[in-house]
Amino acid sequence: MTPTELNLKAKALLETHFDDIVLSGEISKITLHGSGHWYFDLKDERSSIACAMFKGANLKVGFKPAVGNFLELCGSVSLYPESGRYQFIATSMKKAGFGDLEAQFLALKERLQKEGLFDPRFKKSLPKFPKKVGIITSKTSAALQDMLKLIHQKEYFLAKIYIFDALTQGNNAPFSLIQALKKADDMDLDVLIIARGGGSREDLFCFNDENLAREIFKAKTPIISAIGHEIDYVISDFVADFRAPTPSAAIDTLFYSKLDIEQSLDLMEEKLMQLWNYKIQNYENLLLNLSKFFKFNSLPKIIDEKIKQSHNIEKQLNHLLANQMRYNELKLDKLQNAYLQHENFFNKSKKFICIRKNGKIANLEDLKSDDIVILSSQTSQKEAKIL
């Protein structure tokens, strides 16, 4: 038996026993081909299978399937004899809810949004002309080469580029990305780009890691998230300070080309000239108005008016000073009279004597023979005995 004979027998066997069946699972990869045919992988917790839905059948589907969609397909299993590869040929398709990846993504997105990690108030502004730029990505990736090539094409030589190598796919990618982010955030960069080229939903899922999202939120450096293609959204896009649809778009957003800078300088020069001309016109108008004023108001007359104003001010000041002096004199007289009254009372009270018996002030009628008393004046005191 030849490979062709075996494949043909297997094809007949599969198409006989697996005809008109229902298949449910989550899309993990998909290609919407230019021919109109759809090619995708459907997976469950442990396995995946290649699927195809040809143009004649998918025209009846009312939506465009995407990675993460959980689908219910009707169709049959077939085998391609030339390669021996078997696949599921779908004749109908409908959504059956969300797949595991999509459900995890939406749940985390909702929770972080409630915590405020996506709040625009916390977004940091991107620098106008960055001088120190960090890029976190795989150092062997095509995305990095595209970004560096675009920077060179723009002839933007103001910035120094720092590359931080990190995994951008797989279970270990979140930890690798976090370590690179911490290192970059300590280097006082002007801005930081987290980048990865396109891939399946599973390939990009490391950028939906909660710990990575929290590190991005805590970072003091402004961060651009540039993951996948324009249709791809990950958690890092929402928590970063700016989302670029692609890595190349991040460069376009951040860097001006030499031509852009020249045009910007020309525009600034034009605005400065307009402002300068406006100022000159204002000063010319002011001089014209002043010349008209002095023409109708001679200088001696203006000086006389100013002298009269100064005389009036002098009179007002003299009047205020005189009133203040009279007020101070009256206040001084009152204080002097009060002092004299207190002084007279003090002199008279020197002759007064206070009698105390048993520590209390006593009247003469309260005293008896042999009582011991204390006689006190302002200057001395004596003990005495009543006869």
Swiss-Prot record:
Annotated CDD domains: ExoVII_LU_OBF
What's the protein name?
Exodeoxyribonuclease 7 large subunit
Q: Does the keyword NADP apply?
A: no
Q: What is its EC number?
A: 3.1.11.6
Q: What does this protein do?
A: Bidirectionally degrades single-stranded DNA into large acid-insoluble oligonucleotides, which are then degraded further into small acid-soluble oligonucleotides.
Q: Which keywords belong to this entry?
A: Cytoplasm, Exonuclease, Hydrolase, Nuclease
MF (Gene Ontology): exodeoxyribonuclease VII activity; nucleic acid binding
The cross-references to NCBIfam families, in alphabetical order and at most eight, read:
xseA
User: What Pfam families does this protein's entry cite?
Assistant: Exonuc_VII_L (PF02601), tRNA_anti_2 (PF13742)
Oligomer status and interactors: Heterooligomer composed of large and small subunits.
Q: What is the lineage of its organism?
A: Bacteria, Pseudomonadati, Campylobacterota, Epsilonproteobacteria, Campylobacterales
**Compartments, record wording:** Cytoplasm
**Species name for this entry?**
Campylobacter jejuni subsp. jejuni serotype O:23/36 (strain 81-176)
Annotated Gene Ontology cellular component terms: cytoplasm; exodeoxyribonuclease VII complex
Family in the record? Belongs to the XseA family.
Q: What class of enzyme is it?
A: hydrolase
InterPro entries (alphabetical) = Exonuc_VII_L, Exonuc_VII_lsu_C, OB-fold_nuc-bd_dom
Q: Which GO terms describe its biological process?
A: DNA catabolic process
**Gene name, please?**
xseA
